A protein has these predicted regions:
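Conserved active-site-adjacent core of cysteine acyl-enzyme catalytic domains
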Residues: 32-50, 54-69, 73-78, 111-243
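Short, well-ordered loop/turn elements at secondary-structure boundaries
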Residues: 6, 19, 85, 165-167, ...
Length: 243
């Protein structure tokens, strides 16, 4: 039916408030941050890459088996500073900048790194990050290289231990984080870990470039496994054959 002028005067401000809120924040949700987006399709692993991952997994098992004979607690933390991404699709460049600086490969602006990566408004792929960082490493005396893997082809726990025991960071593609949900995909860097194999207490420390939640955070191993699985499952670790 018809709305009286008195009722209409009360409704209009409410509607305006809702419209403004929707425009500024999108769908209201405490955990859905719509400004984050990385929709680039990750190229599938080739047969050659899969075979090399298996070879590296065997090398890692040998390395860690020797470690397990001497102690039950393992931990290492890299000196990595958080870089907050400048826009909604620069999580890849920001993460690559953090890793490059940590490895002594130079200090890049996010725009410079985005150019090297080939980042578009759709974001960046893990393959682009892996290849670009390896290209920068090849220009130094550092023989270590990144290897692109999936959580189904390489266990995150052993990858983290292997990489960080060699002072080498990892990059993860995540979606469902413990404190927020990315609309599509989001890159973060792993800077440290603490694993107690006798009590099964295991944590991973990451640097997150998220424009709202940027910072250093520590989560359980299980939480980070879930975060990677919720996205495309890809991440970049140390190629164990290059150590």
């Amino acid at each position: 039916g018809k709305i009286s002028m008195k009722k209409r005067s009360r409704i209009i401000p409410v509607l305006c408030t809702l419209l403004v809120a929707t425009f500024l924040f999108g769908t209201v949700s405490a955990t859905n941050i719509s400004m984050i987006g990385n929709t680039v399709t990750e190229p599938p692993l080739t047969q050659e890459e899969l075979e090399h991952i298996s070879e590296c997994n065997a090398l890692i098992e040998q390395q860690l088996a020797r470690d397990n004979l001497t102690r039950a607690i393992y931990n290492n933390y890299l000196s990595m500073s958080v870089i907050t991404q400048e826009n909604g699709y620069y999580c890849g460049p920001a993460t690559a900048c953090m890793v490059a600086k940590t490895l002594g490969l130079g200090t890049y602006t996010q725009k410079e790194m985005a150019s090297l990566l080939g980042t578009t408004t759709s974001g960046t792929s893990g393959a682009q990050i892996c290849n670009t960082l390896n290209s920068l490493l090849s220009k130094t005396s550092d023989t270590r290289r990144f290897q692109r893997v999936t959580i189904s082809t390489a266990a995150l726990e052993t990858s983290v231990r292997s990489s960080l025991r060699n002072d080498f960071p990892l990059t993860l593609n995540v979606k469902e984080m413990p404190n927020y949900t990315s609309g599509s995909g989001h890159f973060i860097a792993v800077k440290g870990y603490y694993f107690n194999t006798s009590t099964d207490f295991k944590t991973i420390t990451i640097c997150d470039p998220h424009p709202t939640y940027s910072g250093t955070y520590t989560y359980t191993l299980e939480e980070m496994e879930t975060a990677v699985e919720s996205s495309n499952g890809y991440y970049n670790r140390l190629d164990a054959s290059t150590v």
